[in-house]
């Protein structure tokens, strides 16, 4: 029987390539259900230590970025939201933010875009899936950051021009619910994404459901790849050291041929066992395994051809397909070098849109270490956004994105239905005209302006 379910392949007995990993699966629940006792005022809250140490519970719970008085006050405020989707209903303090927006974070997928180039170039249909799925995994090093990116203002954008041959544009297309759309392109592929995060607040943790649709089109053969990622769990939001895990399946399907990749992100077990590990297979349209894949989402991925039982083919060996690039040491926000480039004006195009995330005053103030100013600017923009909403309602007007159009397509995801936005091509026309312009305005001098109504009094 072919191991169509990678979880079965991992835990299915003493044989099989992934059998040696079964011990980490058998410990599932030890760390994920371990509750550190001793929090008398906060009964029922879990403080999960991924290292599984026997530290004193109260000492462990006191770790993290919060001061005790801030922690107590925030917990009192948040109790009423337990079980709720808090994506946009809660105003959060700047102390938990990183100097980046969700639109910029979408662009981090482009760091290892050369893997999509390789997927387009190869003639091997299964190796194509290895390259493409490794690209999808590569961003998880960035996703482990425990700082929250800023929610984009409605109409906000982020653009990155010709970085390693890739042009990228994203736009906040809806505020309630918060939705972003992104498009990237080079000579080998196009990337299109509609994202609507859904959350569930659980007290000291939060589940983040990636309600969205991600499609990659490889240009040489017109192959369309569809990606469904696993959910993400953020542990120890208020008490303890915050950490992130993404247990579950990632599925990438070749909608043209029916081939697919099923990769299992193992949950963090006792003393950190299993954390970061990813295992699975590339299957053909008949669900027969063709290539096994294994690695860690924060380090590297490798692959090896396999037989119909998922066993490595004789005479073959594991080959590394992706490896994490060097990262800065002791970076406050765990940024990669690429993340710093995303935040910089070095990757900004000529005639940068005034709605660009780089220009946000709250983001920039936080980057400069001025939390007081960042908090003030954040509150001011949120109030301006509320005022714009009231004005639209009074005028009977709906917000219309500039670079993406809403379609009639509603796609089903494991976590709910999603309205799909598509790139309308107008940005390509704008960018071509801007690049041919003689305007050499310093982008740093541009004032942030995503607003629909320019003379609005808040």
Swiss-Prot record:
Where does the record place Basic and acidic residues bias?
375-396
Residues covered by region (Disordered): 47-66, 370-401, 431-458
- What are the protein's UniProt keywords? Lipid transport, Lipid-binding, Transport
Which Gene Ontology MF annotations are present? lipid binding
Q: What tissue specificity does the UniProt entry give? A: Expressed in roots, leaves, stems and flowers.
One biological-process term from Gene Ontology? Answer: lipid transport
Q: Which residues cross the membrane?
A: none
Pfam families, from UniProt? Oxysterol_BP
- Where is this chain compositionally biased, Polar residues type? 443-458
InterPro entries annotated for this entry? OSBP_sf, Oxysterol-bd, Oxysterol-bd_CS
The similarity annotation says:
Belongs to the OSBP family.
> What is the purpose of this protein?
May be involved in the transport of sterols.
Protein name, per record:
Oxysterol-binding protein-related protein 3B
Q: What is the lineage of its organism?
A: Eukaryota, Viridiplantae, Streptophyta, Embryophyta, Tracheophyta
Gene that encodes it: ORP3B
């Amino acid at each position: 029987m072919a191991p169509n379910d990678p979880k079965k392949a991992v835990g299915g007995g003493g044989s099989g390539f992934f059998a040696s990993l079964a011990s980490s699966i058998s410990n599932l629940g030890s760390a994920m259900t371990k509750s550190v006792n001793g929090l008398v005022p906060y009964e029922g809250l879990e403080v999960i230590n991924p290292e599984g140490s026997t530290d004193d519970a109260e000492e462990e719970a006191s770790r993290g970025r919060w001061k005790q008085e801030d922690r107590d006050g925030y917990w009192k405020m948040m109790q009423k939201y337990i079980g709720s989707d808090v994506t946009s209903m809660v105003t959060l303090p700047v102390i938990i933010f990183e100097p980046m927006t969700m639109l910029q974070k979408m662009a981090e997928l482009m760091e290892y875009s050369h893997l999509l180039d390789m997927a387009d170039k190869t003639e091997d249909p299964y190796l194509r899936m290895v390259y493409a799925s490794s690209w999808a995994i590569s961003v998880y090093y960035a996703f482990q950051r425990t700082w929250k990116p800023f929610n984009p203002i409605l109409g906000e954008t982020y653009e990155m021009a010709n970085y390693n041959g890739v042009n990228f544009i994203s736009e906040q297309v809806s505020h309630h619910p918060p939705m972003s759309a992104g498009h990237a392109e080079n000579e080998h592929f196009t990337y299109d994404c509609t994202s609507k995060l859904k959350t569930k607040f659980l007290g000291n943790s939060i589940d983040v459901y990636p309600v969205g649709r991600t499609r990659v089109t490889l240009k040489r053969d017109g192959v369309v790849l569809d990606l469904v990622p696993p959910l993400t769990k953020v542990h120890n939001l208020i008490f303890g050291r915050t950490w992130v895990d993404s247990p579950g399946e990632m599925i990438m399907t070749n909608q043209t041929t029916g081939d697919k990749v099923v990769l299992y992100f193992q949950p963090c077990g006792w003393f950190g066992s299993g954390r970061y590990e990813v295992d699975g297979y590339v299957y053909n349209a008949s669900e027969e395994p063709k290539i096994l894949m294994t690695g860690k989402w924060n380090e590297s991925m490798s692959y090896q051809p396999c037989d119909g039982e998922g066993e490595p083919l004789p005479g073959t060996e594991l080959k590394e397909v992706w490896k994490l690039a060097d990262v800065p040491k002791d970076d406050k926000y765990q940024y990669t070098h690429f993340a710093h480039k995303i935040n910089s004006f070095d990757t900004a195009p000529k005639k940068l849109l005034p709605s660009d995330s780089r220009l946000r005053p709250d983001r920039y103030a936080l980057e400069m270490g001025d939390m007081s100013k960042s908090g003030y600017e954040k509150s001011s923009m949120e109030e301006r956004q509320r005022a714009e909403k009231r004005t639209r309602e009074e005028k009977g007007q709906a917000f219309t994105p500039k670079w993406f159009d809403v379609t009639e397509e509603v796609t089903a995801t494991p976590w709910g239905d999603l309205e799909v936005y598509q790139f309308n091509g107008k940005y390509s026309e704008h960018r071509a005209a801007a690049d041919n312009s003689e305007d050499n305005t310093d982008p740093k001098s541009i004032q942030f302006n995503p607003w629909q109504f320019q003379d609005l009094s808040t």
